[in-house]
Amino acid sequence: MNQPWRTHLQTKLQQLHEQGQYRNLHVTEQAEETWLIRDEKRMLNLASNNYLGLSGDERLKEAAIASTRKYGAGATASRLVVGNYSLYEEVERSICDWKGTEKALVVSSGYTANVGVISSLACRHDIVFSDKLNHASIVDGIILSGAEHKRYRHNDLNHLEALLKTASPEKRKLIVTDTVFSMDGDTAYLRELVQLKEKYGAIIIVDEAHASGIYGIGGAGLSHIEKDLAQKIDIHMGTFSKALGCYGAYLTGDAIYIEYLQNMMRSFIFTTALPPSTLGAVQKAIEIVQEDHKRRENLIANGEYFRSKLREAGFNIGNSSTHIVPIVVGSNENTLRFSKRLQEAGIAAIAIRPPTVPVHSSRIRFAVTSEHTIADLKWAIERITHIAKEEELFV
């Protein structure tokens, strides 16, 4: 191997080890709906994004198999070549009906959706206003666009308005936010953000990755909780890989936006289409989440229970108000030690460290699902609290 490159890579890896930021891949096997086998140990799964337990649903499996038998294992090309099967149009129609929008575009992942939509719409003549805790894919999309990047303090509407006021009137303005923040479990103030975008002549993109399938009418997303709010949002992004239990993502809004992205979004144009099996499962999942209110109700109730009990025990869970519940520890070292002890006790609890979260805010990110029982959560909370006391970390 080229020696200068070897030296450079070895130095960087050593730095990651020293900083407690080195990452390993661990083999995981699904044992039951809420339990898994990780490194040959059975654990309660409190780390998954399978929020509604749909990944293992027999109806999705059957839909995936049927689509594979009809169309084959792979799409064989990009959508703009010969990979645009009728399944795509069926799913996109379902998304529009679900979200109340004019047109939709199914893409390969949430990451490529955010990187693609922002870098396609914005350029060096524009300004993008982004919440400081937005997902990395949003940040990467802004960097790739070359636009002026204005980060406002997390959920600080006064700071955002101050930035909007001082922005050049000649520049186009784009506001972008997560709706449910993936590492903190709190939510954006969508009504107020829409008011600001209208006041200052901006457009707004919302990332519903962790809200699609859960919140709002028929699980259409957090933007659908308040009447008429969704129609004031320019572009909605959501994923199929979390509550819907599948893979892929969507962008939806007014037809002109989607038509533009179809022609200009490089992460859409230059990639092979999703396999038919995925689309078949996605179509079934969209149908299920709109009808199965019980799953969504269970998830919300489980989140409320888990948050309340951790707060009662004295843990710092920030402003979490959803099914995503962090325990903020602080240092990488303490977080890794806590994670290791929890896994030894049979809880899949993964340490989240910089650059995923800000420096000095390393945490254990818990995610409850609709399939957890109160007994599961009570069992976990007892062990979490006991270990934290032993380690003298929180309680």
UniProtKB/Swiss-Prot annotation:
Transferase recorded as keyword = yes
Task: List its EC numbers.
Answer: 2.3.1.47
Q: Which domain of life is it from?
A: Bacteria
Q: Where are the transmembrane segments?
A: none
What keywords does the record list, in alphabetical order? Biotin biosynthesis, Pyridoxal phosphate, Transferase
* Pfam families assigned to the protein according to its UniProt record, in alphabetical order: Aminotran_1_2 (PF00155)
Q: For this chain's UniProt record, which GO biological process terms are given?
A: biotin biosynthetic process
| Cofactor(s) needed for function | pyridoxal 5'-phosphate
Q: Which reaction does it catalyse?
A: 6-carboxyhexanoyl-[ACP] + L-alanine + H(+) = (8S)-8-amino-7-oxononanoate + holo-[ACP] + CO2
Give the binding site residues for pyridoxal 5'-phosphate: 110-111, 182, 207-210, 239-242
Fetch the PROSITE patterns from UniProt. Answer: AA_TRANSFER_CLASS_2
Q: At what positions is N6-(pyridoxal phosphate)lysine found?
A: 242
Keyword Transferase attributed? yes
Its pathway is: Cofactor biosynthesis; biotin biosynthesis
Where do the annotations place substrate binding?
23, 135, 356
What GO molecular function terms would the record report? 8-amino-7-oxononanoate synthase activity; pyridoxal phosphate binding
Q: Which family does it belong to?
A: Belongs to the class-II pyridoxal-phosphate-dependent aminotransferase family. BioF subfamily.
Under the subunit heading, UniProt states: Homodimer.
Q: What does this protein do?
A: Catalyzes the decarboxylative condensation of pimeloyl-[acyl-carrier protein] and L-alanine to produce 8-amino-7-oxononanoate (AON), [acyl-carrier protein], and carbon dioxide.
Protein name (record): Putative 8-amino-7-oxononanoate synthase
State the organism named in the record.
Answer: Bacillus cereus (strain ZK / E33L)
